């Protein structure tokens, strides 16, 4: 079979169908979000690296999150801006698969690190005397390796399942980026395997959410048992940033899934915007949330920029 029919030379990304006339203006907030994500997370990484007092598990996990976020932003927004501002809609088949790979990899890693951060909060509040015994450097290193390897194992089949599909000349993707099911739906063959595997991958995110909820139920029980009002406030402050980041990541994903599954009468551009929020907004807000709410990070950033 002709390889250009089996696998097209390139795909065309339409951007946000229905808002083509506004692409120029839509690009500006996306550009601002991109700058915030990259500069904010680089700042957090720099602060954690240079301040030895922050070299403990909570900030190690934050450093991992701040390493993932620029990757997720870079996987999506530069190509979006090319589509919005310069009508550079074409993306090679290999480039589209590469983009899909990194979007799903970074998304999986972000979910995994949020579980690790929930566990860190759980140990810090429910068993503080054993914190340094439980979360040793070795344990944190193993968790960091798992954060990378688990999504890698689950994402590689996405690429393989796309490579097995013929496309018969279909190459228009009504989206701003290439993701697994968006590419698979262009195929002229059965995508049943892709759908089943996609649901299995989503179940991993559901498992992560359940693990986080269980952790926070136990954390809340422990907090309400504290006799001191100040101790309760300190406990809430310890995990407040993580809760905000968790909601920022999972809520857009939840609404995107629900509108895709049940919102058949919702305009298509709403689906695309929600899918963009899911991968674009969290990387920017994470750095802002931790920069504002975490006292140690905020103090170091202020010192770095305003102390003479």
UniProtKB/Swiss-Prot annotation:
Species in which this protein is naturally found: Homo sapiens
Subcellular location(s) per record: Cell membrane
Keywords assigned by UniProt, alphabetized: Cell membrane, Disulfide bond, G-protein coupled receptor, Glycoprotein, Membrane, Olfaction, Receptor, Sensory transduction, Transducer, Transmembrane, Transmembrane helix
Annotated Gene Ontology cellular component terms: plasma membrane
Membrane topology (Cytoplasmic): 46-53, 120-138, 216-235, 293-308
UniProt GO MF annotations: G protein-coupled receptor activity; olfactory receptor activity
Pfam families documented for this protein: 7tm_4
Cystine crosslinks: 96-188
Membrane topology per record: Multi-pass membrane protein
Family: Belongs to the G-protein coupled receptor 1 family.
Main location: membrane
Top-level taxon: Eukaryota
Lineage: Eukaryota, Metazoa, Chordata, Craniata, Vertebrata
Glycosylation sites noted in the Swiss-Prot or TrEMBL record: 2
Protein name (Swiss-Prot/TrEMBL): Olfactory receptor 52E1
Residue stretches spanning the membrane: 25-45, 54-74, 99-119, 139-159, 196-215, 236-256, 272-292
The protein's role, per its UniProt record: Odorant receptor.
Extracellular compartment segments: 1-24, 75-98, 160-195, 257-271
